[in-house]
Amino acid sequence: VGSEMCIRDSTLHRLIDSIAVADPYLREGARYSVDSLSEVRIRITNALRNRGYYYFRPDFIEYLADTVQQPMKMAMRMMLAADIPPAMLKRYRTGNVTMYVFRNQGGGEPDTFQTRRGTLIQMMPSRFRRELMNECVTMRTGRWFAVRQMNSTQTRLARLGIFNAINLEAE
């Protein structure tokens, strides 16, 4: 276990604490196993990644166990690893959302439309219905980036069955 790290980002500290307190497995008197503690780390990581901490990973969370205080009991402390690069703890917001719809045959003239979800650049002529993008894109400009919304957007676009490639990029 690495040395204890002072968490400079109190928002991250509060989020981890609130997620951990709500986890049904982390209760006083519970029996702990390595697999179960690993699952807790994954649940906390998933929750953080859906709240803007895109690069957060389960191995950033470490457990420190003390079995000396009382016989047959263990005091456990959860903390962040000491060697996490600061960039990995950065919180991200969704920026401008720009969607490109290209023609199968290539070519065409680009036409730009503002939708509720962002800017749509569509190569014309095209029979693609612009309102489909509002239904498929779940990300919102200015909100905390959520992996769940990114996955939902990709799934909805793929289900349309009209795209040969779906690419989500950070700029």
Regions found by a protein language model. Name each.
Residues 1-171:
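Periplasmic polypeptide-binding modules associated with outer-membrane biogenesis and secretion
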